[in-house]
């Protein structure tokens, strides 16, 4: 029979999950991470070089999860580095720009590569970003939803500029990862894969490392700002 202290340790066990953002350059991956982690928006486009990451801790229904969120470079010259960063990921967010049909088609290539590397073990999100530019949309909602369903992914719409759907995206992903990787007595606390300390051989350029402890499962209030998505 488990002692009260054993039960307490199980309750406090933290699932660590590695989440990787993939997509072409300028679709808004870095803006999504910045909005989620710091509730900020930078109207100046800055290219991500190789990769950077932030951390986020959540408490969802008494279950603790720590997300190591990896923001990867979308420029073609960095594509070969992709597998280094998304191996051992529990979650993947593939981002496209709803005003750029080519970014949607290329998102399919990222998903094919993910499936080849990770199979169906990864919790998959497809994100149409820049929903604030809906009048300039070139990717139909029907095509996006049908494709997401065909690959076993959930589809989301976001606007980093207006803070629409961003907190909800990461919260839902965290819930899905917890469902797929529930904490158990056989899993030591703070020991799941995806910890930021497990850096790939090539060290990432860190934009910042932010730890926010024990966020509730309620999304943060929406805030706008900036001039780009």
UniProtKB/Swiss-Prot annotation:
It is a lipid-anchor. It comes from the Eukaryota. A motif (Effector region) lies at residues 45-53. Keywords: Golgi apparatus, GTP-binding, Lipoprotein, Membrane, Nucleotide-binding, Prenylation, Protein transport, Transport. Residues 179-229 are annotated as: Disordered. GTP binds at residues 23-30, 71-75, 129-132. A lipid is attached at residues 227-228 (S-geranylgeranyl cysteine). GO terms for molecular function: GTP binding; GTPase activity. GO terms for biological process: protein transport; Rab protein signal transduction. Belongs to the small GTPase superfamily. Rab family. This is Ras-related protein Rab-21. The gene is RAB21.
């Amino acid at each position: 029979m488990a002692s009260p202290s054993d039960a307490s340790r199980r309750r406090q066990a933290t699932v660590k999950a590695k989440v990787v953002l993939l997509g072409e350059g300028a679709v808004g991956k870095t803006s999504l991470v910045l909005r989620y982690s710091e509730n900020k928006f930078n109207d100046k486009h800055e290219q991500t070089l190789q990769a950077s990451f932030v951390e986020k801790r959540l408490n969802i229904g008494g279950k603790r999860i720590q997300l190591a969120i990896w923001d990867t470079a979308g420029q073609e010259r960095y594509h070969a580095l992709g597998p280094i960063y998304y191996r051992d990921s529990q979650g993947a967010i593939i981002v496209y720009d709803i005003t750029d049909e080519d970014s949607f088609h290329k998102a399919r290539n990222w998903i094919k590569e993910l499936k080849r590397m990770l199979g169906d073990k990864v919790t998959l999100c497809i994100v149409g970003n820049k929903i604030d530019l809906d009048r300039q949309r070139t990717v139909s909602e029907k095509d996006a939803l049908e494709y997401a369903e065909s690959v076993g992914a959930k589809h989301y719409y976001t606007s980093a500029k207006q803070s629409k759907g961003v907190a909800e995206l990461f919260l839902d992903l965290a819930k899905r990862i917890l469902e797929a990787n529930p904490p158990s007595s056989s899993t030591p606390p703070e020991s799941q894969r995806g910890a930021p300390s497990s850096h790939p051989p090539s060290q990432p350029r860190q934009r910042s490392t932010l730890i926010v402890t024990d966020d509730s499962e309620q999304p943060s209030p929406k805030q706008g700002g900036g001039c780009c998505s």
